[in-house]
Amino acid sequence: MSKSPILSSRTLVLIVFSIAINMLGGQISSMIKLPIFLDSIGTLICALLAGPWIAVLTGLLTNLLWGLLSGPIAAAFAPVAMMIGLSAGLLAHAGLFRTLPRVILSGVIITLALMLVAVPIRTYLFAGTTGSGADFFVAYFHAVGENLLESVAITVLGANIADKILSALIAWLLVRRLPLRAQQNFPHMARVR
């Protein structure tokens, strides 16, 4: 029995579908200036169905395409999207997407992992402001005496912990609801029960 290729046609369709979910969620959040992003649900779905490397690729392609369509800010955050995909995929394959408490814990861990990349990008490339709804919080913490790095770190933690827990829950619920026949199309799928 031969192993199926990691980039099957189904996986490529999953990547395209996931990029669309990411961009739709991110655009809606951006248009109404929510302090969360909702731009990684598709990446998390990829992490659960196809593993960390497909999720990394999905995050990268999402942000590069988004950067071409809307401006360079999204492209600058491609390493963050890649970290989200990598950490979610590794957590999923370690069994941390099997129960509700584990999914919530995964959202927290993903947030801590992405902070290693997002805080320096937001601080040093954009001086704390990127045009998102979270800019208000950076300005507030900076105005009450925190330095810029601390203001950005607090804001990134606050905005992303809620966002990544919510995104992880949505992705987990969607993947759990897939019929068994659909799940069998993804041989690298993590266990979600």
Language-model segments: residues:
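Hydrophobic transmembrane alpha-helices
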Residues: M1-L49, W53-L64
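Interfacial aromatic-anchored transmembrane helix boundaries in multi-pass membrane proteins
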Residues: M23-L38, L60-T99, F126
